[in-house]
């Protein structure tokens, strides 16, 4: 799905947008529902297991999000080249993305394997010994999977960049089905607990990476690696990728580090609060499915528009995708608000943890409708235009000034408990939304030279 021949006409028809969006919606739904099933299966092992997986996953997300920023950079560059109809440079940039991801993910995985216990102690401090034991087991196996999830994310981003979101959907389906089947076999069949959950995740990621790399080499794929020599690192395409990837990586990294600081604060509230927070995070992702879907769709659409020099269309499609995201979020959050008392019973939580979980999710539903899309979908339009430094600056300042600092104030000074942690996040969203809306309206985000 690339620009049409007449640049003055719409670059994306309604049919083309639908073809891009529906597999992304299904992919996000699969990812979230399978993730919830994963949490439910681990919950059968006990609250210590849920807590350990939640803590390690917050660290895993930090690492994966930093590395995924490179995939975002590669997708922006590739989509702009495709919008300019320069498939040769688009293909070369794709090859360079795979090289950068392969090298960086292996390096990070090795460091985490060698220093696993030290890293966990530094990040989470003193936690229950059972939680630490489970956490180290889960973290070690997670580290082995980093190269595979990195390559999968890179390949998925490149397929989306060309409008072929069906392949990334199928890869996600493969990964999640294997993960759930593996959980059923290893956790319940062989009684392997947290180790079984980690192994199932690893196997799923291996298959997803192999599948998407195999699909990448299809002769009809404009972003396939045409020559093995194209994988040799080259300065110019790598610098183009890093011009988006480094600011996005710093943004993602500082964002996740901030979340880890908040997780450390949450861990002081007790095992029930940790478990309630873990389930609330898992369940709230259900309501975010429309927003995440539009966030993924924004980069290829806006990237191709700007690569073709169509700034007005970039603005128009940005507003359209943002409107779809807000409408979808209103529907899913309203539904979850009323269903939450029933949903929380699925997770084998104590009465105290269930009450805390339901309370914070209800507040989440209200704020998400009005502020989530402008906080996380809209900035992807800015990134697609090469405005990654601005989104980085806003996200880092807002994250630390509001989410982190206010969370500590709300918990330690006002004794608001888990609710205080979540209200720090809501105020962060409001700040981001205001900054990104003003930046978008002024149009400076479209003035960057990316390729």
Where does each model-flagged region fall?
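Small-residue hotspots at the loop-to-helix junctions and early N-terminal turns
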Residues: 47-58, 135, 139, 198, ...
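Small-residue-rich hydrophobic transmembrane alpha-helices
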Residues: 50-110, 149-168, 274-340, 371-395
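Transmembrane helical elements of multi-pass membrane transporters/channels
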Residues: 19-38, 141, 175, 204-208, ...
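Short alpha-helical transmembrane segments in multi-pass integral membrane proteins
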Residues: 1-24, 78-145, 189-246, 302-368, ...
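Helix-terminus/linker motif at the lipid-water interface of multi-pass membrane proteins
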Residues: 29, 33-51, 120-129, 185-192, ...
